[in-house]
Swiss-Prot record:
It comes from the Bacteria. It catalyses: [[Fe-S] cluster scaffold protein carrying a second [4Fe-4S](2+) cluster] + N(6)-octanoyl-L-lysyl-[protein] + 2 oxidized [2Fe-2S]-[ferredoxin] + 2 S-adenosyl-L-methionine + 4 H(+) = [[Fe-S] cluster scaffold protein] + N(6)-[(R)-dihydrolipoyl]-L-lysyl-[protein] + 4 Fe(3+) + 2 hydrogen sulfide + 2 5'-deoxyadenosine + 2 L-methionine + 2 reduced [2Fe-2S]-[ferredoxin]. It is an enzyme of class 2 (transferase). This is Lipoyl synthase. It holds the Pfam family Radical_SAM. Binds 2 [4Fe-4S] clusters per subunit. One cluster is coordinated with 3 cysteines and an exchangeable S-adenosyl-L-methionine. Its cofactor is [4Fe-4S] cluster. Residues 78-295 form the Radical SAM core domain. The keyword Iron-sulfur applies. Keywords: 4Fe-4S, Cytoplasm, Iron, Iron-sulfur, Metal-binding, S-adenosyl-L-methionine, Transferase. One of its GO terms (molecular function) is metal ion binding. Its EC number is 2.8.1.8.
Length: 327
């Protein structure tokens, strides 16, 4: 897998917060007065298992997105013995202003990473693992082969572990990426739409809503038995009707599983929270998602893309192998 550039003096320098978002098309404007966090936004405190897992991760030099993206559920998920691993480094080639992962020119791929990841999964005794990555626009296949190598390595050392991949959009490299990931499939294929298309210039510069929908639709056509999944955040300026429109678009593109959670601002350099959706409204979205035909919907303030992914997948995999009637 060859890189486009080799000796780059800026490679490996990570920008965060306001430094990262300084050059995006629509500037991040802080609110005069921040919205007060409501009482339902609460994370659970970590247990001893959480600290054991952190030790294993440091030993194996692995990054979890749980840590890098400052996820509020980190204590709960680590305590259950589940984790989402971020491969291909912790420097992203995009500058999305909702995300707490650093931006810059990434380092070369680590050829030992698939083996290290597989060893971590085995050491942590995971039943279910989610693998995600930064965007790697510097790679000719967007990093798809590295995903495949990680899947293969885990299958060899932990054959009973279910694998979900949460992929970037492989912009400009979609054909080759889908081919690679069809040859070495995960158990669940996840790619997040993140928000309504009207907010893409503000929240997801460099990405395209229709392209992301097409990625999942095309993968489903190639691999009908692999459940597809996508997620969005609320609180960036969308309306309830916008959320419903996204759900309808997902179903029109054969996406079976959905996650919807509250956006929380990682720092003052990130997009402000424009609304806190109430637990009652999340319940309404959940009901509407099932009415639209999603096989599983994880919808609530503290839900993130990988939150309770093991439970979601168990249901979706039962349905897809048992011939559910959605397609």
């Amino acid at each position: 897998m060859s890189e486009i550039k080799t000796d780059d003096p800026k490679r490996g320098i990570k920008l965060r917060g306001a430094d990262k978002t300084a050059r995006i098309p629509i500037k991040v404007v802080p609110l005069q007065e921040k919205l007060k966090k409501p009482e339902w936004i609460r994370a659970k405190l970590p247990s001893r298992k959480f600290f054991e897992i952190k030790d294993i991760l440091r030993e194996q030099k692995m990054h979890t997105v749980c840590e890098e993206a400052s996820c509020p559920n980190i204590g709960e998920c680590f305590s259950k013995g589940t984790a989402t691993f971020m491969i291909m480094g912790d420097i992203c080639t995009r500058r999305c202003p909702f995300c707490d992962v650093g931006h810059g020119r990434p380092n070369m791929l680590d050829p030992d990473e698939p083996r290290n990841l597989a060893e971590s999964v085995k050491a942590m005794n995971l039943r279910y693992v989610v693998i995600t990555s930064v965007d790697r626009d510097d790679l000719r296949d967007g990093g798809a082969q590295h995903f495949a190598d990680c899947i293969k390595a885990i299958r060899e050392t932990s054959p009973n572990t279910k694998i979900e991949i949460l992929v970037p959009d492989f912009r400009g490299r979609l054909d080759i990426a889908l081919k690679i990931l069809a040859e070495t499939p995960p158990d669940v294929m996840n790619h997040n739409l993140e928000t309504h298309p009207s907010l893409y210039r503000k929240a997801r510069p460099g990405a395209n809503y229709q392209h992301s929908l097409d990625l999942l639709k095309r993968y489903k056509e190639m691999m009908p038995h692999i459940p597809t999944k996508s997620g969005i955040m609320v609180g960036l300026g969308e309306t309830d009707e916008d959320v419903r429109e996204i759900m309808r678009d997902m179903r029109a593109h054969n996406i079976e599983m959905i996650t919807i959670g509250q956006y929380l601002q990682p720092s003052d350099g990130h997009l402000p929270v424009l609304r806190y959706v109430t637990p009652e409204q999340f319940k309404i979205f959940e009901k509407e998602a099932y009415e639209l035909g999603f096989s599983n919907a994880a919808i609530g303030a503290m839900v993130r893309s990988s939150y309770h992914a093991d439970e979601q997948a168990a249901e979706a995999l039962r349905e897809s192998h048992g011939g559910c009637g959605h397609h």
